[in-house]
């Protein structure tokens, strides 16, 4: 995987956590999660391998020095075991005193180099570890998954959390597309976060429908600490929130345009666009152009507890995505008792009924839905109560059982 809590860049970390946690609830499944650059603060229900601690160039390092240099999740014994499985001369690579490659983590400018390095290290890990199946999350780790399959002869499952068709509104990056397609071609099983995404994989990447499965995401039960966040009473003015990356995939301009329509009918609603992204400045300008800047707030990127405070402080949550493979945010908002409006172009709509769905481009329908929830207490209450009930039944434990069943199926038919 590429992301894992507590270091969260987006939905990929949240889903990676949920999937591995769901699998860990079955006593006889053991997961080893390979991450470019762990923080050392990851939870202990799975084994973490920091790819930045796996040597690719032989260095003669003594035990005590290793003890002082390695983090708490890697022992000197493990380091030596990996060192015994270096399979080629990588001395031309840029490595540190332990013969390991450094990772920036996240999504740096040299992302393609990091993806390639991750794949090289996967060759060492796949030679040293004992395992039954490989599960690679999103295109960043597909090359590593393919490499691990070639080295070990073990089956490969890939998990499509998004495709470049979603991220780019159709202006596909050929390098990314080639990486995605290669991963899919080599995969024995392709798990897609929605039927919407599954159809994209079959249609745009020419994959056999028989190896593609929809595997919807879920949500984790809220901790007591998050449950205890108070819900302010908004008697005078209501609050409507967009929370996510402010990029073209997420449709932020439709939120601003819908807000402008709502504010023609009433002034006692405030709109919040929380997040960061390459369209932030354009959205601030658009709100000003529409004459609604005094009713619009841009608090920036929210992390951890702030996200849940934002949900609870909202009377309506809106996700107007142009192309959303799944979209975990509305489920989190509904968990917090916040009625949600989602675009019909969102995968999560396949498993949600107690939400209002509009086309992303239909700003009039979106504005009507926002206005209705804000001015009709019985509609608000219905969506609040029934929405929470619906989402509380969508658990990672159930997802874990379904993934487990797919693993067994793949292993049974592998090589036949």
Task: Pin down the residues of each PLM region.
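Short hydrophobic beta-strand element within catalytic cores of glycosyltransferases
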Residues: 339-342
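A conserved catalytic-core segment of Leloir-type glycosyltransferases
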Residues: 28-126
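Conserved donor-binding/catalytic core segment of Leloir-type glycosyltransferases
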Residues: 191, 233-259, 384
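Aromatic "clamp/platform" in nucleotide-sugar-dependent glycosyltransferases that forms part
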Residues: 322
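Short alpha-helical donor nucleotide-sugar binding micro-motif in glycosyltransferases
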Residues: 301-302, 309-314
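Carbohydrate-associated surface elements
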Residues: 196, 218
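Conserved acidic donor-binding segment of nucleotide-sugar-dependent glycosyltransferases
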Residues: 355-364, 372-377
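Nucleotide-activated donor-binding/catalytic signature segment of Leloir-type glycosyltransferases, i.e.
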Residues: 282-302
């Amino acid at each position: 995987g590429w992301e894992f809590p507590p270091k969260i860049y987006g939905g990929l970390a949240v889903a990676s956590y949920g999937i591995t946690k769901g699998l860990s609830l079955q006593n006889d499944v053991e997961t080893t999660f390979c991450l470019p650059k762990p923080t050392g603060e990851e939870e202990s229900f799975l084994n973490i391998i920091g790819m930045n601690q796996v040597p690719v160039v032989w260095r003669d390092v003594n035990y005590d020095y290793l003890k002082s240099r390695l983090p708490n999740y890697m022992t000197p014994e493990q380091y030596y075991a990996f060192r015994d499985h270096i399979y080629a001369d990588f001395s031309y690579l840029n490595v540190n005193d332990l013969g390991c490659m450094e990772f920036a983590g996240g999504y740096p400018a040299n992302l393609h180099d990091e993806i390639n390095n991750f794949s090289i290290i996967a060759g060492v890990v796949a030679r040293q570890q004992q395992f039954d199946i490989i599960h690679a999350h999103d295109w960043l780790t597909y090359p590593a998954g393919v490499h691990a399959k070639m080295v070990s002869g073990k089956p490969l499952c890939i998990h499509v959390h998004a495709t470049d068709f979603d991220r780019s509104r159709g202006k596909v990056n050929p390098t990314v597309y080639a990486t995605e397609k290669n991963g899919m071609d080599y995969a024995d099983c392709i798990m897609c976060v929605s039927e919407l995404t599954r159809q994209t994989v079959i249609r745009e990447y020419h994959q056999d429908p028989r190896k593609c499965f929809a595997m919807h995401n879920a949500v984790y039960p809220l901790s007591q600490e998050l449950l205890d966040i108070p819900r302010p009473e908004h008697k005078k003015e209501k609050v409507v929130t967009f929370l996510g990356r402010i990029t073209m995939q997420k449709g932020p301009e439709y939120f601003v345009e819908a807000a402008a329509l709502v504010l023609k009918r009433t002034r006692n609603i405030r709109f919040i666009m929380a997040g960061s992204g390459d369209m932030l400045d354009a959205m601030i300008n658009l709100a000003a152009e529409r004459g609604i800047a005094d009713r619009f707030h841009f608090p920036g990127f929210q992390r951890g507890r702030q996200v849940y405070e934002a949900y609870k402080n909202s009377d309506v949550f809106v996700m107007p995505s142009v192309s959303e493979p799944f979209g975990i945010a509305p489920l989190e908002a509904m968990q917090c008792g916040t009625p949600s409006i989602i675009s019909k172009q969102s995968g999560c709509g396949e498993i949600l009924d107690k939400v209002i769905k509009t086309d992303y481009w239909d700003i009039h329908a979106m504005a009507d839905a926002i206005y209705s929830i804000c001015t009709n207490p019985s509609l608000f209450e219905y969506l609040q109560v029934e929405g929470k009930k619906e989402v509380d039944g969508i658990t990672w434990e159930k997802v874990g059982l379904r993934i487990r069943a797919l693993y067994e199926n793949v292993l049974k038919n592998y090589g036949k």
